A protein has these predicted regions:
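Active-site neighborhoods and metal-handling regions in enzymes and metal-associated proteins
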Residues: 1-184
Length: 184
């Protein structure tokens, strides 16, 4: 669990990281490479005294192909995924953003709505006393309800946040217990 001061600092870090990534998005344009976009994101985070301990970027077709897309020379044309784990004062927050030039595809809209549903189910289930295994099952059931049964097997579903990118990760046998004062 985190102290009240740590929770306040974590919230501030989350807000500042989101703003920095937003500024990076304003500064990039189609045609740039994933590497150039990653550099811009790291630059904006550094301006806010944050370090990106994880920087992932995928453009267009690479989004569907890689769960942890290390930036390449691939150039952005329409759709972009940006991911960071931003660190300041020892604490780490994780965030992802999708950017589209023009109207997003119907498929992307559907996947975004489904991901939001899964996230809402997890937020609702993340209460003191819940186990990581219960949260994993909640996510698996929510994916299935949205027509994405088995999607949970393609990537970890996250877990408690704090001084590591994940203090623990939810999985089917996860015995970790959600405690008051933890961040997710």
């Amino acid at each position: 669990s985190l102290t009240e001061d740590e929770l306040l600092r974590l919230r501030s870090l989350g807000s500042d990281a989101a703003s920095a990534v937003g500024r990076a998005i304003e500064n990039i344009s189609a045609g740039q490479s994933e590497i150039e976009i990653a550099e811009e994101m790291r630059h904006e985070l550094a301006a806010g005294k944050m370090a990106s301990v994880v920087t992932l970027v995928a453009a267009d077709e690479r989004i569907a192909g890689y769960r942890h897309p290390v930036p390449t020379e691939n150039r952005w044309n329409k759709t972009l995924l940006l991911v960071t784990c931003a660190k300041r004062g020892g604490l780490i927050v994780s965030l992802s953003r999708i950017v589209c030039i023009g109207e997003p595809s119907d498929e992307l809209k559907r996947k975004t709505e489904s991901a939001a549903y899964v996230n809402a189910c997890l937020l609702n289930a993340t209460r003191p006393g819940a186990t990581g295994a219960k949260l994993y099952k909640t996510a698996a059931d929510a994916y299935a309800e949205q027509g994405f049964a088995g999607e949970i097997d393609h990537h970890h579903q996250g877990g408690a946040a704090g001084y590591k990118t994940r203090e623990w990760v939810a999985h089917p046998q996860s015995g970790e217990v959600v405690r008051s004062g933890q961040a997710f």
